[in-house]
Amino acid sequence: MLLAIEQGNTNTLFAVHDGERWIAQWRAATDSTRTADEYAVWLSQLLSMAGLALGAFDGCIISSVVPQSIFNLRNLSRRYLHVEPLVIGENAELGIPIRIDKPSEAGADRLVNAIGAHIAYPGPLIVIDSGTATTFDVIAADGGFEGGVIAPGINLSMEALHTAAAKLPRVAIQKPQKVVGTDTVGAMQAGVFWGYIALIEGLIARIKAERDEPLTVVATGGVASLFHGATAAIDKFDPDLTIRGMLEIWRRNQAKA
């Protein structure tokens, strides 16, 4: 069995693949101070509830955008799973061209998404990943990563309003029925949600104009479901895109071993 650990700035996903399908997934708040031992206690309890155990794994793959956490995640795999993990950005061969000025700066999540999208959809593509930050990445027809755009995430935008403006409350994000709000909460929700839709549509249009080629737009990430039905600019919503990419990277590296 394979344990895939996909760590973003806000949440960390632990997913179990039995060789045929994903059989379990759990999320935890990302905490860079959590030790390998703490991860093991938490994970072993969840595995036990699913009829599994830490010792059942013969592989582990890690994708993290939090460098200070990788040490502890690696030790979790070594100490408790008794396997050497495959770490995106360190010892994992991706098998795709990275056509940007500084390839070492490309985030692990963006590269994993590129692979997950390329094997599922005909390219070229724009992959939108909505999390703490929202990324718009261009994937060539041959699967090459060609760069993209990084913007603040929708939750970060709403939190910035509350933090920087003394009289604005902390507000939950939801899709308003109208653009013009008639109270403070409604106005904030409309501004952030519909403003974000405008950002998505505007950046997609500009990327397509700059590339001058047809591009399929695929959205993933923790808050991508918020945008479903709110814009025609997104062609596909794919919540499993990232772990699909991780599984493909694992298989490619196993084939070379």
Swiss-Prot record:
Keywords: ATP-binding, Coenzyme A biosynthesis, Cytoplasm, Kinase, Metal-binding, Nucleotide-binding, Potassium, Transferase. The keyword Nucleotide-binding applies. It is found in: Cytoplasm. One of its GO terms (molecular function) is pantothenate kinase activity. Its cofactor is NH4(+); K(+). Its EC number is 2.7.1.33. It holds the Pfam family Pan_kinase. One of its GO terms (cellular component) is cytoplasm. Pathway: Cofactor biosynthesis; coenzyme A biosynthesis; CoA from (R)-pantothenate: step 1/5. Gene3D superfamilies: 3.30.420.40. A monovalent cation. Ammonium or potassium. The active site is at residue 109. The keyword Endoplasmic reticulum does not apply. It catalyses: (R)-pantothenate + ATP = (R)-4'-phosphopantothenate + ADP + H(+). Belongs to the type III pantothenate kinase family. NCBIfam families: baf, PRK13318.1-2, PRK13318.1-6, PRK13321.1. Homodimer. This is Type III pantothenate kinase. It comes from Phenylobacterium zucineum (strain HLK1). The lineage of its organism: Bacteria, Pseudomonadati, Pseudomonadota, Alphaproteobacteria, Caulobacterales. The gene is coaX.
